Amino acid sequence: DKIVTFLGRITMQKGPEYSVEAANMVLHRTRNVRFCMAGSGDMMDQMIYLAAERGIADRFHFPGFMRGKQVYECLKDSDVYVMPSVSEPFGISPLEAMQCGTPSIISKQSGCAEILTNCIKVDYWDIHALADAIYSICHNDSLFHYLQDEGKKEVDQITWEKVGAWIRELYMRTLGW
């Protein structure tokens, strides 16, 4: 089975319900996918209930809050990472996933969508696009390996020096210098 992971605070800001609804759509097309929703937050019970209500609780795992080594082990064991955030100033977790070689699907509304190119970007509310992206990565080996390899290369090249230079350049252009 393929493993699709949502890792973060299980709160309205992170859009966990979109992940569960997309999972439901994926599982109507194939049963060889399992979903992991790692984290804690005020919507945890609601997500467990939603998975049960949709009849997909047997394909979901809710391990709770993770830190440090647990996070990296979870990401390395995953085939796809999803971050359907409604509001996300930046979002470091997709970079961590990509660094582990895990293809990522992120919200176009997240800050990291501005700098990442080797991932799939969807509108957070578009569960059809999210489901299609999950299904595609899980069932298209070429796409999986491309996102795995190129995503890792991309995040391995991100350094504070490069980010600082990019921000400086942005300010210079904005100020017309």
At which residue positions do the language-model features occur?
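A charged, aromatic-enriched C-terminal amphipathic alpha-helix characteristic of glycosyltransferases
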Residues: 142-172, 176
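Conserved acidic donor-binding segment of nucleotide-sugar-dependent glycosyltransferases
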Residues: 119-128, 136-141
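Conserved donor-binding/catalytic core segment of Leloir-type glycosyltransferases
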Residues: 1-14, 20-23, 36, 148
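Aromatic "clamp/platform" in nucleotide-sugar-dependent glycosyltransferases that forms part
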Residues: 86
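Short glycine/serine-rich donor-binding loops of glycosyltransferases
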Residues: 91-94, 112
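Short alpha-helical donor nucleotide-sugar binding micro-motif in glycosyltransferases
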Residues: 65-66, 73-78, 167
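Nucleotide-activated donor-binding/catalytic signature segment of Leloir-type glycosyltransferases, i.e.
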Residues: 48-66
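Short hydrophobic beta-strand element within catalytic cores of glycosyltransferases
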Residues: 103-106
